[in-house]
Regions:
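Metal- and O2-centered redox machinery and metal/ROS homeostasis
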Residues: 1-192
């Protein structure tokens, strides 16, 4: 039996996007967001612009049926507070709040998988920022502290593994995850 058949749907999704995820992680690591305040402010600016686009994701009606505290998971206000703590202006950026309004459930679930999965990296970065820049959940690193809260959350993987999805919906799930990563790379290229 091929190994791929032994993987859960969430594990297959993770494997399907692993190359682009690794590429983003390596690029962010090379930018050294915890090395100094200027690098960290650029990182927060990137997160802010990306989170602006995600507002509609946290309002998607179908996701609310399955994901507890979905509204609480948005971190845009925390990034605003962090940038304010650091006396850094908010970027002038157009919002795209309706991107997810009529999107297919499997597609937005793929996006959410990427966003929530990024919390593992953010939690690690939060520890580095606290150690190297002396920022924390009270000043300058609220966003990263909140990410740490959800980094061990298995609810989403459980949902992905147990939903009844046809082949097309499974492909749409992967497409959503890939689009989320490509969109992040787009903003990363613009801001760095």
């Amino acid at each position: 039996m091929p190994i791929l058949e032994l993987l859960s749907r969430a594990e297959k999704l993770k494997q399907a996007i692993s190359i682009i995820t690794d590429d983003i992680d390596h690029h962010l690591l090379a930018l050294a967001p915890s090395a100094d305040l200027d690098n960290y402010k650029k990182f927060l600016t990137l997160q802010y612009v990306y989170q602006l686009e995600l507002k509609g994701l946290y309002e998607h009606a179908d996701l609310h049926q399955y994901i507890d505290n979905l509204h609480d998971r948005t971190r845009l206000s925390l990034i605003k507070q962090d940038l304010d703590d650091l006396k850094h202006p908010l970027p002038n950026h157009q919002q795209y709040p309706c991107r997810f309004q009529n999107a297919d459930f499997a597609y937005v679930l793929g996006w959410l998988y990427v966003i929530e999965g990024a919390q593992f990296s953010a939690a690690t970065l939060g520890k580095q920022v606290e150690a190297e820049l002396k920022l924390n959940n009270q000043r300058g690193a609220r966003y990263l502290a909140k990410a740490s809260e959800y980094s061990k959350d298995c609810q989403l993987n459980h949902l992905i593994d147990n939903l009844e999805l046809c082949e097309q919906q499974q492909a749409t799930l992967i497409e959503g995850a890939e689009q989320a990563l490509q969109r992040f790379k787009f903003y990363q290229a613009q801001l760095y």
